[in-house]
Design a protein with these regions (language model features):
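Conserved ABC ATPase "signature" region
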Residues: 1-14
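Conserved ABC ATPase signature
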Residues: 19-23, 27
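Conserved catalytic motifs of ABC-family nucleotide-binding domains
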Residues: 40
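Catalytic Walker B motif of ABC-type/P-loop ATPase nucleotide-binding domains
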Residues: 44-47
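Helix N-cap at the start of a conserved alpha-helix in ABC-type nucleotide-binding domains
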Residues: 55-57
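Helical segment within the ABC ATPase nucleotide-binding domain
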Residues: 59-71
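H-loop/switch region of ABC-family ATPase nucleotide-binding domains
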Residues: 80-81
């Protein structure tokens, strides 16, 4: 029963009886998140959770993380290389370059200069903010 509740929390209860290999990449990612939620964690560590997803699905998965963080008070720690998603969906950002922390603070306060330092001038963040 908890498994079905976890699938419902991530919006894919209707896929409960579908084989995982028949699900889209985004749906598979949500199954992974549901499996994690089923364990009642206090923290979720996610390594590149949107790396192979299309932009729409990536935003949907990021929204799932934000909602889970806020509704269930679960800390979410993401390793993500999509700067625009990190800035739009995360409260805090830690920017690392060559093993050294370049920035550690609110996503809303990171500057282009700091992003350039992290990415050697290749980062081009979006200015659009999400409604989280």
């Amino acid at each position: 029963m908890r498994a079905l509740e976890s699938l419902d929390k991530v919006g894919i209860l209707d896929k409960a009886y579908t084989r995982c290999d028949q699900l889209s990449g985004g749906q598979q990612q949500r199954v992974a998140l549901a499996r994690t939620l089923n364990q009642n964690p206090s923290i979720i560590l996610a390594d590149e959770p949107v790396a192979s997803l299309d932009p729409v699905t990536a935003r949907q998965v990021m929204s799932d993380f934000v909602r889970i963080n806020k509704e269930y008070k679960i800390t979410i720690l993401l390793n993500i290389h999509h700067v625009d998603l990190a800035l739009n969906y995360c409260d805090s950002v830690i920017g690392v370059r060559a093993g050294e922390i370049v920035f550690d603070g609110p996503a809303s306060s990171i500057t282009q200069e700091q992003l350039d330092e992290v990415y050697n001038g290749t980062a081009v963040p979006t200015t659009e903010k999400s409604d989280n």
